[in-house]
Amino acid sequence: LTADVDFRFYVGIHHPRMAWPLTLRGFRVCVSANVLRDRLGDVPFLGCDAPWFLDSGAFTQVALKGRFEQSTDDYAATIRRFAGTGLIAASTQDYMCEPVALRATGLTLRRHQALTIARFDAIRAAGTAGVHLLPVLQGRTPDDYRRHLEGYGARIGYGAWVGVGSLCKRQGDPGVIAAILDAILLD
């Protein structure tokens, strides 16, 4: 990994009320769309004027239910709803590639990658009110991630801010994660 790569880390929280104490201390937070979807009003949490990130809640929906309960249009509306706060980016509704997710859908890894790109395109077409829609790369091996990056084509430019999915639940050798990042950082 090169020293000039800008890695951004966000503290994932499962309840909006946990955000404010963290933002007061200078931490950036990542809040799931699953917990914000039914909130009333346009204020996701106290302290939302600080930069924060919206996670699509994909793992809960896909791994536990085998599909997305929230349409791409509804998710784009959620992004637009909070665009006037400190929301700086939202992840696409990606189909992760952990074995549990593949079993839940009954689909192949390559199909999950194609569905992730299709949902990215649909959310972007629905509009995000200027909030960056983060493309997410999915796979299991370095070649999988590289192929997914290539599948996005011109949608992802050089030096783009992207998410790298299906890493957080891995156990074992951290060198595997380094190999994945090396494979996609070539471009």
Please provide the spans of the model-predicted regions.
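Non-catalytic, usually N-terminal nucleic-acid engagement modules in DNA/RNA processing proteins
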Residues: 1-124, 128
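Core catalytic architecture of nucleotide-activated donor-dependent transferases building glycoconjugates
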Residues: 107, 111-116, 127-129, 142-157
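Glycine-rich phosphate/ribose-binding loops and adjacent secondary-structure elements
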Residues: 134-187
